[in-house]
Amino acid sequence: MLVCVSLLILIHSVPVSPVTVSSRNPKVEVHEFSDAELSCEFKTEKDTNPRIEWKRKDKEKDVSFVYYGERFVGPFQDRADIEGATVRLRRVTQADAGEYRCEVSAPSDSISLGETNVTLRVLVPPQTPSCDVPSSALTGSQVELRCRDRHSIPPAVYTWYKDNRALPIRHPNATYTVNEFTGVLIPQSHYNPGTVCQHCMYHPNYHIPNTQLTTTFQTHDLNVAAVVSAVVLVCVILFLCAFGVCLAHRQGYFSRHRGRSFWIPHCHGVTHISSQNLNPSEHTQHSGYSHPPKEPQDFKHTQSFML
């Protein structure tokens, strides 16, 4: 009996070393189109040939296999190698970014499963930024100068230049507002930024080369003399038009016809009959000539002229 108890105590006193999995670099950051090493190290208690699997969780939280059944699957078949449990990916892109998990399964161990996570971040250098800058503006008007790059990772940091001198982000007497993270420059209404503005981007923490774009922005003062001349010219034109209308009215070009007129439709057009044709007697009174009376019932020839 004492022997059994001693054996049990001895078994429980022996330290058990279950499978352990770890990574030398749990957060990996590499430039786009370079190689990435996903470190995975393990120790087992008894099993000398454990099963190794790699899985990946993308930005949409979808889980897929990277290494399964002692071979790479999916898009990693021809551009990945494994040594022990460490995976090396060649020419990584933004599509490869995400969270990777290394799983080691040792059925012979008391604790048969161990895992560790490795996060891969692919850095994208800044490209030539898109520019939203008006070519010119009137002095005193409110404008916004924008510079942005939507593809750089991490997000770009922007610096604006005036006459090849960087504009300070924070200045007590600044006549502008600059947001280094959004790339927006808002000059104040009385600020003249000059004729040339240069803006660039940089990543000071990741040693990515600067990318810059130069553009031209000009301010023009309002031409008061031209505005006054235009107003005077419009007033002169309106005065001449009014004077011409009054003169034409005095000359009778706008007087109405006093006689009445009637329009009678014809077969092939319209016949116009005036009031003078309807009342010939009124017209002949002024001419001094009257027609002789006619007797429609007893018509006789009359002698019109005396010889």
From Swiss-Prot:
The membrane topology term of the UniProt record is:
Single-pass type I membrane protein
Which superkingdom, per the lineage?
A: Eukaryota
> Which SUPFAM superfamilies does the protein's record reference?
Immunoglobulin
A Gene Ontology BP annotation from the UniProt entry? cell-cell adhesion
Secreted: is it a keyword of this entry?
Answer: no
Which ranges does the record mark as transmembrane? 227-247
What ranges does the record give for the region Disordered, renumbered to this chain? 278-307
> What's this protein's name?
Junctional adhesion molecule 2A
